[in-house]
């Protein structure tokens, strides 16, 4: 049976794969308009929040908008309803539409903007282009009655523990005998007050990023049958989980720069691209960074990219790219629209696992300000 859900629960689900901790310092993320403490039935994912986006949300009875670009990015000195920005906020409040922004945290996230762009290009052996976040790993060891091992292991895996490379739900189990004596006031799941109890238990071990500790412990306590859960958490000596902006990987087959530029235009479904470099130069290794990636041309070159795909390329940065021998293809900032469908599908799948009664869909409003002649 499906469960009613509120906005806070949807955002908690969203932040499992795109936590606020991933955002670069000073980014304007999180709830920007309205409240999450209300029931939601319809959630719309959009790249931009413009007045026409809000009109679409009103028409489709949307309760919550999840946007990549924050509608409130610079401090507001006033909100006047005879200006577009003020009307946008007024409409959201009047129609009880909450607006939540996930900007650079969604760029960085696994399955976020840059992964979607790399996937659209069919890149293999992908790595982070610009590291921005390092998350040390921790290990959890918990003692579980034998018949409840599977339920706890599944809950921990679903909460994000046990993720190693391209594998999820990784864990190790070993059997033993646990002992305890319930004292006055205890309500033991097994045993009697004042009597020593010996129980066949399983020691279950798994790893998780430190940033997910609260989520993992919450899942542990919810799934574990004991009143008082015996568990240990400790740091492990292994490379921290590295996250960041952009991706770099290899094409499935070599192309010329011109062929690749047309390939980008098709895969990103844009009306045109700009290209820097010799048309017939060979392209195999590709760096891609959604949005404005002007400041990262040197990182792309240092990591061996034959071509750098990014938006909003500046005139003088294009000259710099030419001088260092880096090809560039600029599909525009609007190439990030790929996040609408990708994010909506990912969040829909996660909500389905929770059996939430909610509809999550991509906005259909075209917010690209540019027309190509």
Where are the regions that the model predicts?
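Hydrophobic structural segments
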Residues: 1-373
């Amino acid at each position: 049976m499906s469960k009613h859900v509120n906005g806070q629960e949807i955002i908690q689900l969203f932040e499992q794969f795109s936590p606020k901790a991933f955002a670069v310092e000073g980014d304007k993320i999180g709830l920007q308009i309205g409240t999450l403490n209300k029931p939601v039935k319809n959630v719309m994912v959009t790249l931009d929040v413009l007045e026409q986006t809000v009109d679409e949300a009103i028409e489709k009875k949307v309760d919550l908008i999840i946007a990549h670009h924050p509608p409130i990015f610079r401090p507001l000195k006033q909100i006047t309803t005879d200006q577009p920005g003020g009307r946008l906020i007024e409409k959201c409040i009047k129609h009880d539409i909450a607006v939540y922004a996930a900007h650079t945290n969604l760029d960085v996230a696994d399955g976020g903007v840059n992964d979607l762009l790399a996937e659209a290009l069919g890149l293999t052996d992908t790595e982070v282009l610009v590291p921005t976040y390092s998350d040390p790993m921790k290990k959890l060891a918990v003692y579980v009655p034998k018949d409840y091992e599977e339920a706890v292991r599944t809950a921990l895996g679903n909460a994000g523990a046990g993720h190693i490379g391209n594998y999820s739900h990784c864990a190790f189990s070993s059997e033993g005998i646990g002992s305890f004596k319930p004292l006055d006031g205890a309500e033991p799941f097994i045993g009697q007050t004042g009597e020593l109890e010996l129980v066949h238990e399983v020691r279950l071990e798994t790893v998780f990023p430190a940033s997910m500790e609260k989520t993992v412990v919450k899942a542990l306590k919810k799934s574990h049958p004991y009143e008082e859960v015996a568990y240990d958490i400790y740091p492990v000596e292994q490379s921290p989980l590295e996250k960041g902006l952009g991706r770099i990987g290899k094409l499935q087959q070599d192309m010329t720069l011109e062929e690749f530029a047309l390939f980008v235009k098709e895969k990103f479904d844009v009306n045109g691209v700009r290209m820097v470099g010799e048309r017939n130069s060979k392209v195999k290794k590709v760096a891609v960074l959604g949005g404005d990636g002007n400041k990262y041309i040197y990182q792309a070159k240092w990591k061996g990219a034959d071509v750098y795909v990014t938006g909003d390329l500046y005139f003088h940065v294009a000259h710099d790219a030419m001088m260092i021998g880096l090809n560039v293809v600029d599909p525009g900032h609007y190439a990030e629209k790929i996040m609408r469908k990708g994010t909506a599908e990912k969040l829909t799948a996660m909500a389905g696992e929770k059996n939430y009664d909610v509809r999550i869909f991509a906005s259909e409003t075209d917010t690209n300000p540019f027309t190509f002649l």
